[in-house]
């Protein structure tokens, strides 16, 4: 299967939002939270990298991704150089990082482009009668709060959705939460125990949050995660 780039745009320094279409299918089937893999030959070597879907299934062959340019990277520089109409080999979406059914109140914890699968999940599952969701999103700088306007609009429309952006390196104008996401877990949990937790981001953050949650007495079956280096 091949993917053809429709358009891409910068949404933060060194971060781009991509819209692709999967060729050869009328509808690309996947569950919100899953990932696809791209493959290309770079420097004579076949390189494959996995990227989380950043959109809910659209009922068409189109899908969206959110990628940061890794320097030095193997595949991301190639993707950042792609022009509309360019093609790249892709695989059918896979992955187990999806919302457990039946869904219940959940806390989504993500850093950087690890917010992508949560955008997919929220687009698909957040509605007037859905469980309550909290998105605890950590980045260094305010300029890297990806999809901020979308999440803020969701929080206005659906009072049972809470968007909690957190900056680890804020400037003097920032009035929101500060530090790492781990510091705000207890506030997000309140006194609730009937919760599920979804963790996506760098390995260090995911491991730290898992340890905190286990220390608070939550069962490992309540904790779902996807991590990367």
Language-model segment annotations:
Residues 1-84, 140, 169:
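Ferredoxin-reductase
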Residues 2, 60, 132, 136-229:
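Reductase modules of NAD(P)H-dependent flavoproteins
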Residues 33, 114, 202:
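Short, conserved phosphate/pyrophosphate- and ester-handling motifs at nucleotide-, phospho-/glycolipid
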Residues 50-61, 100-112, 216:
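Short, compositionally biased
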Residues 91-102:
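A short, basic/flexible loop-to-alpha-helix module at the beginning of a structural domain
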Residues 115-126:
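Histidine-anchored nucleotide/phosphate-binding helix
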């Amino acid at each position: 299967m091949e993917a053809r780039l429709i358009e891409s745009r910068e949404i933060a320094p060194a971060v781009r939002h991509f819209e692709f279409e999967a060729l050869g299918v009328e509808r690309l089937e996947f569950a919100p939270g899953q990932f696809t893999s791209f493959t290309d030959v770079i420097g004579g070597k076949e390189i494959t990298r996995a990227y989380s879907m950043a959109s809910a299934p659209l009922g068409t062959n189109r899908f969206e991704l959110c990628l940061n340019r890794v320097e030095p990277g193997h595949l991301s520089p190639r993707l950042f150089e792609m022009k509309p109409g360019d093609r790249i080999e892709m695989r059918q979406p896979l992955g187990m990082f999806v919302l457990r059914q039946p869904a219940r109140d959940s806390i989504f914890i993500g850093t950087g482009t690890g917010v992508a699968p949560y955008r997919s999940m929220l687009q698909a599952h957040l509605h007037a009668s859905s469980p309550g969701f909290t998105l605890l999103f950590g980045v260094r700088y305010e300029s890297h709060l990806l999809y901020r306007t979308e999440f803020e609009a969701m929080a206005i429309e659906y009072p049972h959705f809470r968007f909690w952006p957190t900056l680890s390196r804020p400037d003097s104008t920032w009035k929101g939460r500060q530090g790492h996401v781990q510091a705000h877990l207890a506030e997000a949990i309140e006194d609730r125990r009937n919760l599920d937790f979804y963790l996506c981001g760098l390995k260090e953050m995911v491991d730290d949050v898992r340890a905190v949650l286990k220390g608070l007495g939550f069962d490992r079956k309540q904790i779902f995660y996807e991590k990367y280096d």
